[in-house]
Design a protein with these regions (language model features):
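Sequence/structural segment immediately N-terminal to covalent heme-attachment motifs in c-type
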Residues: 1-19, 182-187, 191
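Electron-transfer interface patches adjacent to heme c in soluble/periplasmic c-type cytochromes
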Residues: 32-104, 109-132, 136-155
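Sec-exported extracytoplasmic/periplasmic mature domains
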Residues: 7-10, 14-21, 77, 89-93, ...
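Juxtamembrane amphipathic/hinge helix adjacent to a transmembrane helix
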Residues: 152-176, 180
Length: 207
């Protein structure tokens, strides 16, 4: 999943978005060799120890999109994985938008749909429904305008893998930290048993 997400990130996101707190050589942590990193993921860097930066500068980004494309190094920590997954799945065509695209969870987003060739093009109709108490709920009706190269299941998997990779980029040591945490808790549990036994031994004459 992480390798698939890294490939999607390099092919579709790294054209505009930096991940400047992440170095290419850290991708060895997810099972990629240096040769695989060089051949498949490094399009704007010469050395495997460089950070993931793009040639697009903030000034050009603001001119093209209205705002500079944000760095994605910690986007999963600031937005959450669930939000990113929903965001990637809810783009739709909007002729009123400057880019021709809009998003259901991020209205008037400046970013066009980078994965549209995979998901295809869709339209969205938001239908409000009011109950007897006057509470209004919204129904989102999606319609396919043009199919993409992936079906719904495949695209959802692509979005999931990309989000997993962004979570990894936000904290590359996260997996090892969790493993270390489990070991530490296990050791503390053993120490607690010995400490409790020692306490009973010290206090048995008093009780």
């Amino acid at each position: 999943s992480l390798q698939s997400g890294a490939r999607t990130f390099a092919n579709y996101c790294l054209n505009c978005h930096d991940a400047q707190f992440m170095r290419y050589n850290r991708l060895a942590d997810i099972g990629l060799t240096e040769a695989q990193i060089r051949d498949n993921l490094m399009f704007a860097a010469d050395k495997v120890g460089e950070t993931m930066k793009v040639a697009l500068g903030p000034k050009d980004g603001k001119e093209w999109f209205g705002v500079p494309p944000p760095d994605l190094s910690v986007i999963a920590r600031s937005r959450s994985a669930d939000w990113l997954y929903t965001y990637l799945r809810t783009f739709y065509r909007d002729p009123k938008a400057a880019t021709g695209w809009n998003n259901a969870v991020f209205p008037n987003v400046a970013m066009p749909h980078a994965l549209w060739t995979l998901q295809g093009e869709r339209s969205l109709e938001v239908v409000p429904h009011a109950d007897k108490a006057g509470h209004v709920s919204l129904e989102y009706k999606w319609s396919e305008l043009r199919p993409g190269t992936q079906n719904t299941v495949q695209y959802d998997a692509t979005a999931r893998d990309l989000v997993n990779f962004l979570v990894y980029v936000g904290e590359p040591a996260g997996r090892s930290r969790k493993n270390i945490g489990v070991v530490v808790l296990f050791v503390l549990g053993i120490l607690f048993v010995f400490a409790y036994a020692l306490k009973k031994e010290y206090w048995k004459d008093i009780h």
